[in-house]
């Protein structure tokens, strides 16, 4: 069973994440950052991942610590749920459109953290959500899941659409990369024999 429960408790935040990589896309989300909850829901639904995230953070200052720490904790949960990564496809990619916006996300569960994020949002905020925080979320995830992640918004005029296509594509890319390949059962998808 590929699931994990991870808690992160600091002076700034208290985060708990529960995931089931072989779920159906159900989510229970309570981060205190409504637009971010909407984006996390995209990961769950399009990744077919059952996801529960609860967060208490210093949002009276701003949402930075909460969003970043959810990324960290979700990354740790993925690493724990995938274990030694035997039998997974390892690589995943997706292109997702939403009206005028189009984004591409490519992920490699390589064990080597690296974020390559190319997004030029058309505005700085989506409602109350600072678009810079999307990158902070992905950086936290990458560092703690041990993945290489390429995020490219190829076009878009509406910042909400830009961000939503990125999170949907991320969910779909994760789903592909974490998929078990029966032909690779028990094998680590690397010529090194380890990831």
UniProtKB/Swiss-Prot annotation:
Which compartments is it annotated to reside in? Cytoplasm
Q: What is its EC number?
A: 4.2.1.19
- Please state the pathway this protein functions in, per its UniProt record: Amino-acid biosynthesis; L-histidine biosynthesis; L-histidine from 5-phospho-alpha-D-ribose 1-diphosphate: step 6/9
Q: Name one GO cellular component term.
A: cytoplasm
Which gene is transcribed and translated to give this protein?
Answer: hisB
Protein name, as recorded: Imidazoleglycerol-phosphate dehydratase
* Catalysed reaction equations from the record: D-erythro-1-(imidazol-4-yl)glycerol 3-phosphate = 3-(imidazol-4-yl)-2-oxopropyl phosphate + H2O
Similarity annotation: Belongs to the imidazoleglycerol-phosphate dehydratase family.
Q: Name one GO biological process term.
A: L-histidine biosynthetic process
Q: Which organism is it from?
A: Azoarcus sp. (strain BH72)
């Amino acid at each position: 069973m590929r699931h994990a429960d991870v808690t992160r408790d600091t002076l700034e935040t208290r985060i708990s994440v529960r995931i089931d990589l072989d779920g159906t896309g159900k989510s229970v989300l309570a981060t205190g950052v409504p637009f971010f909850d909407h984006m996390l829901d995209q990961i769950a639904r399009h990744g077919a991942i059952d996801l529960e995230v609860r967060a208490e953070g210093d949002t009276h200052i701003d949402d930075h610590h909460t969003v970043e720490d959810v990324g960290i904790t979700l990354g740790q949960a993925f690493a724990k749920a995938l274990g030694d990564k035997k039998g997974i496809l390892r690589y995943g990619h997706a292109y997702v459109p939403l009206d005028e916006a189009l984004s591409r996300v490519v992920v490699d569960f390589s064990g080597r953290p690296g974020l390559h994020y190319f997004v030029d949002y058309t505005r700085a905020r989506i409602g109350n959500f600072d678009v810079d925080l999307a990158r902070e979320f992905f950086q936290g995830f990458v560092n703690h899941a041990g993945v290489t992640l390429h995020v490219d918004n190829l076009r878009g005029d509406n910042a909400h659409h830009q961000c939503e296509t990125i999170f949907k594509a991320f969910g779909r890319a994760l789903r592909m990369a974490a998929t078990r390949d029966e032909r690779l059962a028990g094998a680590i998808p690397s010529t090194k024999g380890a990831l």
